[in-house]
């Protein structure tokens, strides 16, 4: 993959209605927020640019933010707005709630897309994952310019992307697992494994934990 050959668009403007209106991209799974995990996958894959279509958030270095017009107009409008900022010839279009998406998955999508207009993941049942794909930027721009509905499937399906089926290793969570419902979120947190609450000050800290933190961790049954 050539440096600078692809960028990332993260669609993060949903209302989280199935999660009781919670700020879904800001929910924590494992040691990080959902949106930070997706952004980290893009950075690790060598993305030249990461554009988030959604509210601005602190703590996401190297990320630019845009808002669809009008706000809340839906994913197609958000994609249209974000594409106006895209500068790379290829762009990954991703949901903001994919805690197990990794750089290796994005690299696989980018490689598969080389032979066509784009490539998307399919899950273990063969269902297309429209918000886990990589596309020719100009192809998307042309498609969205002439599209006046609000369905991503209706927009992207006719482009006939390459379907990429990745088989996770035993015990590895699937990269397409999203967090649309409370049940999805619980499953993702279970798969991510036990972690200490943020107030303990661990997170991604590089300094060794204090004795008090170690004791609390032992009481909670997790590693410090």
Name each model feature, range by range:
Residues 16, 134, 202-206:
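Intrinsically disordered, low-complexity sequence elements enriched in Ser/Thr/Gly/Pro
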Residues 129-135, 177-178:
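Short glycine- and hydrophobic/aromatic-rich loop-to-beta-strand nucleating segment
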Residues 2-130, 142, 148-149, 160-168, ...:
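Nucleotide and nucleotide-moiety/phosphate-recognizing core
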Residues 136-153, 208:
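Short, positively charged, low-complexity/disordered linker segments
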Residues 82-83, 117, 137-138, 157, ...:
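General N-terminal targeting signals
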Residues 2, 150-224:
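Conserved alpha/beta core of the MobA/IspD/sugar-nucleotide pyrophosphorylase nucleotidyltransferase superfamily
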């Amino acid at each position: 993959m050539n440096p600078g050959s692809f960028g990332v668009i993260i669609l993060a403007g949903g209302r989280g209605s199935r999660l009781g209106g919670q700020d879904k991209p800001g929910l924590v799974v494992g040691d990080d927020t959902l949106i930070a995990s997706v952004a980290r996958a893009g950075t690790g894959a060598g993305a030249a640019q990461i554009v988030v279509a959604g509210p601005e958030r602190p703590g996401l270095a190297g990320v630019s933010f845009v808002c669809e017009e009008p706000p809340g107009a839906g994913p197609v409008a958000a994609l249209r707005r974000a594409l106006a900022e895209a500068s790379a010839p290829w762009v990954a279009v991703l949901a903001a709630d994919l805690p197990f998406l990794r750089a290796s998955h994005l690299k696989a999508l980018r490689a598969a897309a080389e032979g066509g207009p784009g490539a998307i993941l399919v899950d273990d049942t063969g269902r297309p994952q429209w918000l886990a794909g990589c596309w020719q930027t100009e192809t998307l721009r042309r498609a969205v310019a002439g599209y006046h509905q609000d369905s991503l499937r209706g927009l992207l399906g006719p482009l006939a992307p390459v379907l990429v089926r990745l088989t996770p290793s035993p015990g590895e969570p699937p990269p397409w697992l999203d967090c649309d419902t409370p049940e999805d979120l619980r499953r993702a947190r279970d798969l991510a494994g036990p972690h200490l609450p943020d107030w303990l000050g661990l997170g991604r800290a590089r300094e060794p934990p204090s004795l008090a933190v170690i004791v609390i961790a032992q009481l909670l049954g997790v590693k410090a």
